[in-house]
Amino acid sequence: MTSSLLAASLIIALGQSPESVSTEPAEPAASFIQTRLSFLAGDTDFDAPDATTRFHVALDARTAELASGLHAEAAVSVFINPVAVSGAILQDNASFFGLRYRPSSWAPDERLALTVFPVSATRLYMGHENPVAWARISSLTRTGNDGEPALELRLSRRRWDAFVAAKLPSLQNGATQELERRLMLLVGAGVNLSPALRLEAGAANLDLGPGSRPYISGREGDIYTRGVSGRVMWRHGVPVGANVDLALYEGDPTFFERFFAPDVYPGGFGAHVALEGSYVSQQLFDSDSTEWGAMRKQAAHAAALVTRLKWDRLRLHALAYYRTPSFMVLANPGFPLESTLYEQMESLAELSATVGADYFLQDWGLTPGFLVRVTAPATLKSLVPMPMWPRSNPLIVRGTTSYSYLPEGAERSPILTAKATARWDLGEVAGVLAELFYTRDPNQTTFANDDTGVAVVVWDSQDIVGGNLLFQVRF
């Protein structure tokens, strides 16, 4: 468990519902204004000084009908991050404005939508289950200071939907060192084969431009990311809803709105089963080539299987996923940066399985739950070169920019997490989420000097206890 759990990953926004690929809310019947305030406090390790707090403000506005079938809407979504004693930094969270058009002959959930994201667009991405989603951010390697605006056009009909989107990140040209706008294209479609069965597919292409090393002139020197994602989903009975686990929604800009949306318990049985996969190819510098500036393609893979069941007020959920190390660092690729993995590296994918249950106590508005997760972390074995400091220690890849070494000759070990959760719905105006978890991570290490004064990797404490608290009000 790392401190990234409570970083910018946990975000609150309007967007994709858990049962659809759409990134937009339902069509409003009339004008609507809502303010949403959220406070998040957490400590991923009570024994370490890494406690964090965040405050989020969101204002959502939707107009009544402007013309026949035409509505407008906008959302301002901002984080207020504390700095020093009394300072704060504002961080945009995919604020947007747009138009929604629905002819009178269309069904209520059908529409043509145009959405503009003027600052950032983390709600536009590939994949579905959050641990295996990608393309939220184009690149962390050469990102500029001018944001990542985007434009999306989406058509939703009763049996199918499709979208096309363009992101325009400001990235540094590796050859000229100047900032320039690059283009990231995303397309996707979904079709309901029956009321229960749905198929979805999408693709993305991002040209990052010239790399930061000399290369032979021509387009073959550009660094790019291209990939496809697909999902098959089966649903039956009453809506199940999402499980209560912040750790599984790292980087998801819609989790908190989906989580605090009113859940329904009409009685009876409901099921949601989905299988998805992604294949991504990146053109990077060839780490093994003797030709300076040579390029090579590197593949990245991910897959996930999710099952959620509901019986009256009891919900059961399970999630298993697979991610290669190259997939986990798509936005910040390479060892070193923007380079392929060395051929002598043995790459072990991350494997994770989570099972849990919760029960809704209607008289209290309380939903207590418990879950268990086992994870084999992604690992790079053999030589892992670092600039000016080559090491042969196995490297644990924990996230896009989070790594840790194992002692030489050591093997990765499974990470066990047990977590108790509680969701408390206070009518339609407020909600509380509390988590308390225990993690046993045998891969925890630190650095210490040996007898000769040289820093070496040594084992650290395996046991971690932490917790999170989220409070949200709406008016």
Could you describe each region identified by the protein language model?
Residues 17-32, 46-54, 69-71, 107-113, ...:
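Signature for the C-terminal beta-barrel architecture of outer-membrane proteins
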Residues 116:
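Conserved, mostly hydrophobic/aromatic
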Residues 1-27, 475:
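Cleavable N-terminal export/targeting peptides
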Residues 88-103, 107-108, 130, 135-137, ...:
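Surface-exposed, well-ordered secondary-structure segments
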Residues 57-63:
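Histidine-anchored nucleotide/phosphate-binding helix
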Residues 76-94, 122, 127, 138, ...:
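Subset of outer-membrane beta-barrel
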Residues 415-431, 435-445, 450-455, 466-475:
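C-terminal functional modules
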